[in-house]
Amino acid sequence: MPERVIGILGGMGPLATADLFRRIVEKTPAKRDQDHPRIIIYNNPKIPDRTAFILGNGPDPRPELITSARKLEECGADFIIMPCNTAHFFAGTIQSSVIYPLVSMIEETAKRIEEMGLRKVGLLATDGTIKGMVYHRALLKRGIHIAVPNKKDQGLVMKAIYEGVKAGNLELGRELLLKVAKKLERRSEGIIAGCTEVSVVLKPGDLTVPLIDPMDVIAERAVKLALGVEDF
């Protein structure tokens, strides 16, 4: 199969976008520069907050998402990935606006969890991802149940994401997320790092159950698609 150009629809947020690029580079079996896949990144931090819109108190991010996807297509991307879990609430709209495939981080993660044989997983994610049933739809159709934090702990997750990682305070983000994750792992067989900011600060060795990181999952899939090892 021919090699493909990866398109990254980024900016949600910029740190998560840079983190995904790094992971793709690290997961590529390269011995020289020329062995790496071509990657086009459109980093658009002007995309309105996805969670705010889903909760009914923010502007619509779809116009900027569609514009960004089309720019990647114009630049020659063969497929698109998004380092933002909540943005996958709009995956259908984005896909219908372009010809090339949108490879869903959510679906790829759900497949990985199914392959692991897990039947109940905890979810650390934004209010928008939870309310929008972004992971629920992908997992429940596979018979996998989801545990989410209680209202108080979910507030800590949102604080960790917005006042911690997105604001550049990684230490605060990590501290709050670990606190919630430790509670959630007691009633789960694994924990999904269901927000790219969570992926930035939590690592597999932090918990006694597996930490399923969608950023790793999509990075691995993107490399295989780009190098022609796998097909869509």
UniProtKB/Swiss-Prot annotation:
SUPFAM superfamilies: Aspartate/glutamate racemase. Its EC number is 5.1.1.13. Coiled coil: none annotated. InterPro entries: Asp/Glu/hydantoin_racemase (IPR015942), Asp/Glu_race (IPR001920), Asp_race (IPR004380). GO terms for molecular function: aspartate racemase activity. The active site is at C84, C195. It catalyses: L-aspartate = D-aspartate. Keywords: Isomerase. Substrate binds at D49, R50, T51, N85, T86, A87, K166. Belongs to the aspartate/glutamate racemases family. NCBIfam families: asp_race. This is Aspartate racemase. It comes from Thermococcus sp. (strain KS-8).
